[in-house]
């Protein structure tokens, strides 16, 4: 088998299994399409079960929060299971569950069915921790941030195609993108069944799973007790709250402020995906040569603060060009923060703990994405369309201070 070769500082040869790398990237790409394809139509699927736009906005954000709530509880368990039994079986089961969740959401018929679909998606959506653990297994630590950047770029490619495709498919019915999303995710599972190699060798696996590893709260307490991770995770938590709010309200926002259709809503997510690709292809490699992971993360935070400012102005003045500029800037900040954050986290522990730490990290992100959409939805309907963006400026500013102080303390 052809292998990509890398070398560590001790000149000990390390190899990256090309087959594993290709599977991982294709899997992330298909996941990006599956997620993105449904994004433009969620408010329209909710509309028949609500009485007004205010109620519709609340339900849409609750659907996002329910998904994140399930990820919060599932991610540590999935990470622990992958540390014990390997990444392959966990990923396959999660992909099948996600396909089922999309299908149920598309069938609909009642509001509780939509929530049931999101719950199933959320329980199996914790597989993102296993995907990052998978890449941590197959990449040397000194190149891990670069490969996490590849993951971000490939996911970005999926989120370019997915929302655009979802917006076009919505012309044939708002449920059609959900069915196609289920099909794409199922295709990913079939591909993985035949071509995915196991990345987590048996001699690196944990011997047993304790309750502590399955409990998200004890897991969080354990991870936050690690001094080298605490400030990193707290800063990310503060950043993810407004990001969750933006994710939860953005489709409703452009409907209310700009009267956009599903096809135009798909454009929003495509912008973020395009920015991901451009950043990872042209910007991130140069940044990695000159800056540390922490410095890149802080640059991403500054970009997001500026982006939220543009989004707030677009809401106040109803100017969609300003909104689009803000989304490009947000996409840049998000695209460089994610790989640098995951690089910092993965380099903090050894291979036997990757699933646990990535699972805990995803739980923190999920917790923020539970809180974010709820707060964002409430202030959106009570304080105005610009309020969630102003919240983003304040919280990401606080996150920047936390991470900066953490970097200075470590030095």
Cite the ranges covered by each PLM segment.
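C-terminal ends and interior cores of transmembrane alpha-helices
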Residues: 96-109, 303-317
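Helix-to-loop junctions at the C-terminal end of transmembrane segments
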Residues: 74-86, 279-293, 380
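Short amphipathic helix-loop junctions that connect adjacent transmembrane helices
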Residues: 41-57, 248-265
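Cytoplasmic helix-loop-helix junction between adjacent transmembrane helices
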Residues: 117-156
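Central cavity-lining transmembrane alpha-helices of secondary-active solute carriers
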Residues: 62-78, 270-283
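Juxtamembrane intracellular "pre-TM" segments in multi-pass secondary transporters
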Residues: 5-18, 197-235, 257
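Conserved MFS/SLC helix-loop-helix module at the cytosolic interface between two early adjacent transmembrane helices
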Residues: 73-109
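A membrane-interface helix-boundary motif in multi-pass transporters
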Residues: 170-183, 378-396
